[in-house]
């Protein structure tokens, strides 16, 4: 309320209170005050039905899949010149929703590879992936002599030196196309549950325009732009525990 009164007295219009990621500050809960404007540097997910609002970095992505292609056996196929999802879909005549896209990062500490698999029509939310990994990461540089084959990376047969994550968007899809870890080669008929039975799903996707609201469940999310003009953090005992801060109460 204090922030809201300050903004009102300053004559700042349309300041939205949105859920956000705590980032470096830490703590379990944080909220940002966003001045809504088309030239804002941040993206905000807003539900016009129930009023839910969150920075896209913190907004859960809820995906409901429909199986339009029936389950098939895993099959290695030649796919020359298909290093992107668009080229692959055009070559095989399939929708991007039936592809498992590999997005590659490296840990800042040791440059080890992290591969996040996500439905081909969606994008990775780097904040969510950073939180899942538990340390800082950066987009990968894949050299010619790398253990990864750029443009054709897949979970079947991938090096055990690579940390692999599967986004929730792949759960329950019967038929997927994914890289075969060889140049100009993909697997068709890939099924996560069958072909990678130990896979664990994590929410890594960016919420999208028209996406499902995490609060009311309606597919009406709007993505707006905003400028952060305030931020509050619920730190709890994050810093007091880390620094072993204690005090003597009336009982000593």
Give the positions of each predicted feature.
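Extended, low-hydrophobicity, polar/charged segments
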Residues: 1-252
